[in-house]
Design a protein with these regions (language model features):
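Alpha-helical transmembrane bundle and helix-membrane interface signal
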Residues: 94, 147-161, 205-212
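N-terminal TM1-TM2 helical hairpin plus the immediately adjacent luminal interfacial "cap"
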Residues: 13-132, 179-189
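C-terminal ends of transmembrane helices
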Residues: 4-8, 85-94, 149-155
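Hydrophobic transmembrane alpha-helices
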Residues: 89, 144-148, 197-205
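Central hydrophobic cores of alpha-helical transmembrane segments
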Residues: 106-108, 159-163, 167-172, 190-193
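Membrane-interface micro-motifs in multi-pass membrane enzymes
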Residues: 127-148, 162-164
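C-terminal transmembrane module of polytopic alpha-helical membrane proteins
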Residues: 1-16, 25, 175-289
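Membrane-embedded alpha-helical segments of multi-pass membrane proteins
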Residues: 79, 134-142, 188-195
């Protein structure tokens, strides 16, 4: 099976965190082709993509509250963010749905961007060349999970077992210590995303799910632009004939195939797509056609 088919299966049957990883990697590859200056060794993102600390610019480029989060300043910037996203996203989906993860991620992206713009508007942080990166959104997911299940045990390489609140507190502490040293705008965005993650869980525990803002928006788009459902009731005149009994073997085979698909999907949800064997990946690809 080709690598392309392998990627298609991973995207189709993976969790929301995997889809977000694919989106970020795809955007990074585009940015390398379009905006990377190989002689200088840096990206020169246009103002139509990155987020500027300027309300007047934001008023005419509101989409940058989303686009900035899907581009990264370097490969290692992307790699670290996606490692944390994969880790935090899986933990989040232990308790919540994929729709909620997408909602927290995108709202965290928007609000961390607004925090960045507000900080440079009302606080004297000097000049900023703009903001890119998904760190604020990822911090929202991580802090939301830590707020909901602070005592959850996680195992870290070279460190061992710690509780989720301890790991999250260290990450937040690093941002606070670096707030006035370097990349001030980035750290403000991280902390803004973290604050949203905390507020999201507190409101959720009181019965208000802010992620429905995002899921409701996408549901509305699907209703407006999705395929129209055909009328389920259609008057048909036909001569009645007693249907011939269907072979039992066909039903058994269908049930067996569906059971095998369900078993593979359960394996993906528990251990990830990479845990599948080559035969299982091939079977899933053929079944998905």
């Amino acid at each position: 099976m080709s690598m392309l088919n392998d990627i298609k299966i991973a995207y189709k049957f993976g969790g929301m965190e995997q889809k977000l990883i694919f989106w970020n990697v795809g955007a990074f590859l585009v940015s390398v082709v379009v905006w990377y200056q190989f002689r200088l060794g840096v990206f020169l993102f246009p103002t139509e993509v990155k987020l500027l600390a300027d309300f007047s610019h934001l008023a005419y480029h509101p989409w940058t509250l989303l686009t900035y989060g899907f581009f990264h300043a370097s490969f290692f910037h992307l790699l670290f963010n996606l490692m944390v996203l994969n880790f935090a996203g899986k933990l989040f989906q232990t308790f919540f749905t994929q729709k909620q993860l997408l909602g927290v991620y995108l709202l965290g992206l928007i609000l961390s961007g607004l925090g960045f713009v507000l900080a440079f508007r009302f606080l004297d942080f000097g000049l900023s060349s703009g903001l890119v990166g998904a760190s604020g959104a990822i911090m929202a997911v991580l802090v939301a999970t830590a707020t909901y299940a602070p005592q959850m045990n996680i195992r870290l390489l070279l460190i061992g077992q710690v509780q989720l609140w301890q790991f999250t507190l260290v990450i937040l502490g690093i941002d606070l210590l670096q707030l006035f040293t370097e990349n001030t705008g980035g750290h403000v965005a991280h902390l803004s995303g973290a604050l949203f993650g905390f507020v999201y869980i507190k409101l959720l525990q009181q019965g208000t799910d802010l992620s429905k803002i995002i899921s409701g928006f996408f549901d509305t788009l699907a209703q407006l632009f999705g395929p129209k459902k055909k009328n389920a009731f259609k008057k048909v005149h036909r001569t009645y004939q007693k249907p011939a009994p269907k072979p039992a073997m066909k039903v058994v085979i269908k049930d067996k195939t569906q059971q095998q698909i369900d078993d593979i999907l359960d394996k993906i949800s528990q251990s990830g797509y990479d845990s599948l064997s080559a035969d299982e990946k091939e079977f899933l690809f053929k079944a998905g056609k």
